[in-house]
Amino acid sequence: MENVYGSTPKERELILRKEKVVRCTEMGRYLMGFFKIIIAGIVFAVITIVASVILYGVFAASSASALVAGGKTDGLAGDTGIDGFNVFLIVVQSVALLLNLAGAYFIIRMNKFFDGFKTAGLFYIAQGVLSFIMVFTSDGAYMFFQTLSAIMSVVYMMNFAITMSKALEPTDSYLSDEWTKLKKIFVYLLIASGVCIGICIVPGLAFLGLIGLPIICLGFLAMSVWYIVLVYKSADSMKVVAKREADALSKEENAALA
Protein backbone atom coordinates (compact mmCIF):
# COMPACT_ATOMS: atom_id res chain seq x y z
CA MET A 1 0.00 0.00 0.00
CA GLU A 2 1.35 3.38 -0.99
CA ASN A 3 2.02 6.06 1.61
CA VAL A 4 -0.73 8.66 1.36
CA TYR A 5 0.57 10.89 4.17
CA GLY A 6 1.92 14.20 2.97
CA SER A 7 0.03 13.94 -0.30
CA THR A 8 -2.56 16.41 -1.51
CA PRO A 9 -6.24 15.39 -1.27
CA LYS A 10 -6.33 14.73 -5.01
CA GLU A 11 -3.16 12.62 -4.87
CA ARG A 12 -4.51 10.65 -1.91
CA GLU A 13 -7.73 9.94 -3.79
CA LEU A 14 -5.75 8.78 -6.82
CA ILE A 15 -3.57 6.47 -4.69
CA LEU A 16 -6.61 4.96 -2.97
CA ARG A 17 -8.37 4.39 -6.29
CA LYS A 18 -5.32 2.63 -7.71
CA GLU A 19 -5.13 0.45 -4.61
CA LYS A 20 -8.82 -0.34 -5.06
CA VAL A 21 -8.12 -1.55 -8.61
CA VAL A 22 -5.30 -3.80 -7.39
CA ARG A 23 -7.37 -5.12 -4.48
CA CYS A 24 -10.43 -5.91 -6.56
CA THR A 25 -8.37 -7.44 -9.38
CA GLU A 26 -6.48 -9.79 -7.08
CA MET A 27 -9.48 -10.70 -4.93
CA GLY A 28 -11.50 -11.42 -8.06
CA ARG A 29 -8.74 -13.74 -9.26
CA TYR A 30 -8.44 -15.52 -5.91
CA LEU A 31 -12.20 -15.94 -5.54
CA MET A 32 -12.52 -17.31 -9.07
CA GLY A 33 -9.69 -19.74 -8.32
CA PHE A 34 -11.50 -20.81 -5.15
CA PHE A 35 -14.74 -21.24 -7.11
CA LYS A 36 -13.00 -23.51 -9.61
CA ILE A 37 -11.59 -25.61 -6.75
CA ILE A 38 -15.10 -25.97 -5.31
CA ILE A 39 -16.48 -27.13 -8.67
CA ALA A 40 -13.55 -29.52 -9.10
CA GLY A 41 -14.32 -30.93 -5.64
CA ILE A 42 -17.98 -31.48 -6.54
CA VAL A 43 -17.08 -33.23 -9.81
CA PHE A 44 -14.52 -35.35 -7.99
CA ALA A 45 -17.08 -36.27 -5.31
CA VAL A 46 -19.59 -37.42 -7.93
CA ILE A 47 -16.94 -39.49 -9.73
CA THR A 48 -15.84 -40.95 -6.39
CA ILE A 49 -19.38 -42.02 -5.48
CA VAL A 50 -19.87 -43.77 -8.82
CA ALA A 51 -16.42 -45.38 -8.66
CA SER A 52 -17.01 -46.47 -5.05
CA VAL A 53 -20.19 -48.33 -5.96
CA ILE A 54 -18.50 -50.06 -8.89
CA LEU A 55 -15.24 -50.89 -7.12
CA TYR A 56 -16.94 -52.04 -3.94
CA GLY A 57 -18.87 -54.57 -6.01
CA VAL A 58 -15.69 -55.67 -7.78
CA PHE A 59 -13.70 -56.04 -4.56
CA ALA A 60 -16.60 -57.79 -2.81
CA ALA A 61 -16.88 -60.25 -5.70
CA SER A 62 -13.11 -60.79 -5.60
CA SER A 63 -13.26 -61.50 -1.87
CA ALA A 64 -16.15 -63.94 -2.31
CA SER A 65 -14.34 -65.74 -5.14
CA ALA A 66 -11.20 -66.02 -3.03
CA LEU A 67 -13.19 -67.50 -0.16
CA VAL A 68 -14.88 -70.06 -2.39
CA ALA A 69 -11.66 -71.00 -4.16
CA GLY A 70 -9.78 -71.33 -0.89
CA GLY A 71 -12.59 -73.14 0.84
CA LYS A 72 -12.25 -70.82 3.84
CA THR A 73 -14.87 -69.22 5.99
CA ASP A 74 -12.69 -67.18 8.35
CA GLY A 75 -12.57 -64.19 5.98
CA LEU A 76 -8.79 -64.19 5.61
CA ALA A 77 -8.95 -65.11 1.95
CA GLY A 78 -11.02 -62.00 1.27
CA ASP A 79 -8.54 -59.58 2.83
CA THR A 80 -7.12 -58.66 -0.58
CA GLY A 81 -10.45 -57.30 -1.79
CA ILE A 82 -11.04 -55.38 1.44
CA ASP A 83 -7.51 -53.95 1.43
CA GLY A 84 -7.90 -52.91 -2.20
CA PHE A 85 -11.02 -50.88 -1.41
CA ASN A 86 -9.31 -49.30 1.61
CA VAL A 87 -6.42 -48.20 -0.61
CA PHE A 88 -8.97 -46.65 -2.97
CA LEU A 89 -10.51 -44.71 -0.07
CA ILE A 90 -7.09 -43.45 1.03
CA VAL A 91 -6.32 -42.24 -2.51
CA VAL A 92 -9.70 -40.50 -2.69
CA GLN A 93 -9.18 -38.72 0.63
CA SER A 94 -5.64 -37.73 -0.38
CA VAL A 95 -6.96 -36.02 -3.52
CA ALA A 96 -9.73 -34.40 -1.46
CA LEU A 97 -7.10 -33.09 0.97
CA LEU A 98 -5.06 -31.62 -1.89
CA LEU A 99 -8.17 -29.85 -3.21
CA ASN A 100 -8.83 -28.60 0.32
CA LEU A 101 -5.31 -27.16 0.62
CA ALA A 102 -5.61 -25.55 -2.82
CA GLY A 103 -8.86 -23.87 -1.78
CA ALA A 104 -7.32 -22.71 1.50
CA TYR A 105 -4.44 -21.15 -0.44
CA PHE A 106 -6.82 -18.85 -2.32
CA ILE A 107 -8.70 -17.96 0.87
CA ILE A 108 -5.58 -17.13 2.89
CA ARG A 109 -4.09 -15.06 0.04
CA MET A 110 -6.99 -12.61 0.41
CA ASN A 111 -6.02 -11.88 4.01
CA LYS A 112 -3.58 -9.19 2.82
CA PHE A 113 -6.63 -7.12 1.90
CA PHE A 114 -9.06 -8.00 4.71
CA ASP A 115 -8.35 -9.57 8.09
CA GLY A 116 -10.38 -12.69 8.72
CA PHE A 117 -9.57 -14.69 5.60
CA LYS A 118 -6.51 -16.27 7.22
CA THR A 119 -8.59 -17.50 10.15
CA ALA A 120 -11.22 -18.86 7.76
CA GLY A 121 -8.53 -20.55 5.68
CA LEU A 122 -6.93 -22.23 8.70
CA PHE A 123 -10.27 -23.65 9.83
CA TYR A 124 -10.87 -24.78 6.23
CA ILE A 125 -7.56 -26.67 6.35
CA ALA A 126 -8.40 -28.14 9.77
CA GLN A 127 -11.67 -29.51 8.40
CA GLY A 128 -9.88 -31.13 5.46
CA VAL A 129 -7.13 -32.65 7.61
CA LEU A 130 -9.64 -34.09 10.09
CA SER A 131 -11.65 -35.60 7.23
CA PHE A 132 -8.45 -37.23 5.96
CA ILE A 133 -7.59 -38.62 9.41
CA MET A 134 -11.04 -40.21 9.63
CA VAL A 135 -10.01 -42.72 6.94
CA PHE A 136 -7.52 -44.28 9.35
CA THR A 137 -9.90 -44.46 12.33
CA SER A 138 -12.89 -46.58 13.27
CA ASP A 139 -15.83 -46.71 15.68
CA GLY A 140 -15.59 -44.12 18.48
CA ALA A 141 -12.49 -42.41 17.09
CA TYR A 142 -14.21 -41.99 13.71
CA MET A 143 -17.20 -40.26 15.32
CA PHE A 144 -14.87 -38.04 17.35
CA PHE A 145 -12.97 -36.80 14.29
CA GLN A 146 -16.18 -36.50 12.29
CA THR A 147 -17.63 -34.25 15.00
CA LEU A 148 -14.46 -32.14 15.10
CA SER A 149 -14.51 -31.84 11.30
CA ALA A 150 -18.13 -30.66 11.39
CA ILE A 151 -17.27 -28.05 14.04
CA MET A 152 -14.36 -26.78 11.93
CA SER A 153 -16.72 -26.50 8.94
CA VAL A 154 -19.17 -24.43 10.97
CA VAL A 155 -16.47 -22.07 12.26
CA TYR A 156 -15.02 -21.73 8.75
CA MET A 157 -18.38 -20.87 7.22
CA MET A 158 -19.11 -18.24 9.86
CA ASN A 159 -15.69 -16.59 9.49
CA PHE A 160 -15.72 -16.70 5.70
CA ALA A 161 -19.24 -15.28 5.36
CA ILE A 162 -18.54 -12.46 7.82
CA THR A 163 -15.25 -11.52 6.12
CA MET A 164 -16.75 -11.69 2.63
CA SER A 165 -19.52 -9.34 3.75
CA LYS A 166 -16.94 -6.84 5.03
CA ALA A 167 -14.80 -7.19 1.90
CA LEU A 168 -17.71 -6.46 -0.45
CA GLU A 169 -19.26 -3.66 1.59
CA PRO A 170 -17.17 -0.86 -0.05
CA THR A 171 -17.83 -2.05 -3.62
CA ASP A 172 -21.06 -4.12 -3.72
CA SER A 173 -23.52 -3.56 -0.88
CA TYR A 174 -26.02 -6.02 -2.38
CA LEU A 175 -23.62 -8.98 -2.32
CA SER A 176 -22.36 -7.86 1.08
CA ASP A 177 -25.91 -8.15 2.40
CA GLU A 178 -26.32 -11.54 0.69
CA TRP A 179 -23.32 -12.92 2.59
CA THR A 180 -24.80 -11.59 5.83
CA LYS A 181 -28.11 -13.28 5.01
CA LEU A 182 -26.28 -16.53 4.24
CA LYS A 183 -24.60 -16.41 7.65
CA LYS A 184 -27.92 -15.80 9.42
CA ILE A 185 -29.69 -18.63 7.59
CA PHE A 186 -26.76 -20.92 8.39
CA VAL A 187 -27.15 -20.08 12.09
CA TYR A 188 -30.92 -20.67 11.92
CA LEU A 189 -30.37 -24.08 10.30
CA LEU A 190 -27.85 -25.03 12.98
CA ILE A 191 -30.30 -24.06 15.73
CA ALA A 192 -33.11 -25.95 13.98
CA SER A 193 -30.86 -29.01 13.70
CA GLY A 194 -30.14 -28.92 17.42
CA VAL A 195 -33.84 -28.57 18.23
CA CYS A 196 -34.78 -31.50 15.96
CA ILE A 197 -32.08 -33.73 17.45
CA GLY A 198 -33.31 -32.79 20.92
CA ILE A 199 -36.91 -33.60 19.98
CA CYS A 200 -35.83 -36.98 18.60
CA ILE A 201 -34.84 -38.15 22.08
CA VAL A 202 -38.10 -36.99 23.70
CA PRO A 203 -40.59 -39.88 24.06
CA GLY A 204 -43.68 -39.32 21.97
CA LEU A 205 -42.16 -36.48 19.94
CA ALA A 206 -39.43 -38.36 18.10
CA PHE A 207 -41.52 -38.55 14.92
CA LEU A 208 -41.59 -34.74 14.73
CA GLY A 209 -37.82 -34.63 14.85
CA LEU A 210 -37.56 -37.31 12.19
CA ILE A 211 -39.86 -35.28 9.95
CA GLY A 212 -37.92 -32.08 10.54
CA LEU A 213 -34.40 -33.44 9.95
CA PRO A 214 -34.88 -34.23 6.21
CA ILE A 215 -36.31 -30.74 5.69
CA ILE A 216 -33.31 -29.21 7.44
CA CYS A 217 -30.96 -31.33 5.31
CA LEU A 218 -32.63 -29.90 2.21
CA GLY A 219 -32.14 -26.45 3.72
CA PHE A 220 -28.41 -27.08 4.14
CA LEU A 221 -28.24 -28.34 0.54
CA ALA A 222 -29.95 -25.20 -0.77
CA MET A 223 -27.63 -23.06 1.37
CA SER A 224 -24.58 -24.85 -0.06
CA VAL A 225 -25.73 -24.06 -3.61
CA TRP A 226 -26.34 -20.44 -2.60
CA TYR A 227 -22.85 -20.30 -1.06
CA ILE A 228 -21.23 -21.51 -4.30
CA VAL A 229 -23.25 -19.03 -6.36
CA LEU A 230 -22.21 -16.19 -4.03
CA VAL A 231 -18.53 -17.11 -4.37
CA TYR A 232 -18.85 -16.89 -8.17
CA LYS A 233 -20.87 -13.66 -8.09
CA SER A 234 -18.40 -12.10 -5.66
CA ALA A 235 -15.47 -12.98 -7.92
CA ASP A 236 -17.29 -11.53 -10.92
CA SER A 237 -18.27 -8.39 -8.99
CA MET A 238 -14.65 -7.75 -7.98
CA LYS A 239 -13.51 -8.09 -11.59
CA VAL A 240 -16.24 -5.72 -12.84
CA VAL A 241 -15.39 -3.10 -10.21
CA ALA A 242 -11.66 -3.36 -10.98
CA LYS A 243 -12.24 -2.94 -14.72
CA ARG A 244 -14.66 -0.04 -14.25
CA GLU A 245 -12.29 1.81 -11.92
CA ALA A 246 -9.27 1.11 -14.13
CA ASP A 247 -11.11 2.41 -17.21
CA ALA A 248 -12.18 5.55 -15.33
CA LEU A 249 -8.61 6.22 -14.18
CA SER A 250 -7.31 5.68 -17.70
CA LYS A 251 -9.81 8.16 -19.16
CA GLU A 252 -8.94 10.76 -16.52
CA GLU A 253 -5.21 10.36 -17.18
CA ASN A 254 -5.74 10.65 -20.95
CA ALA A 255 -7.90 13.74 -20.45
CA ALA A 256 -5.21 15.32 -18.27
CA LEU A 257 -2.57 14.70 -20.94
CA ALA A 258 -4.73 16.05 -23.76
Give, region by region, the residue ranges found by the protein language model.
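Proline-rich intrinsically disordered, low-complexity coils
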Residues: S7-P9, P170, P203, P214
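Low-complexity, intrinsically disordered extramembrane tails and loops of integral membrane proteins
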Residues: M1-C24, A69, K239-A258
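Acidic, glycine-rich loop-and-strand cores that form catalytic or ligand-binding grooves
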Residues: F160-M164
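Perimembrane loop-to-helix junctions flanking transmembrane segments
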Residues: A64-I82
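Generic N-terminal initiation segments characterized by hydrophobic and/or small/turn-forming residues
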Residues: E11-E13, A64, T73, V202, ...
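Hydrophobic alpha-helical transmembrane segments in multi-pass membrane proteins
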Residues: V22-S63, G81-F106, N111-N159, T180-A235
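Membrane-helix boundary/juxtamembrane motif in polytopic membrane proteins
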Residues: S165-G194, M238-S250
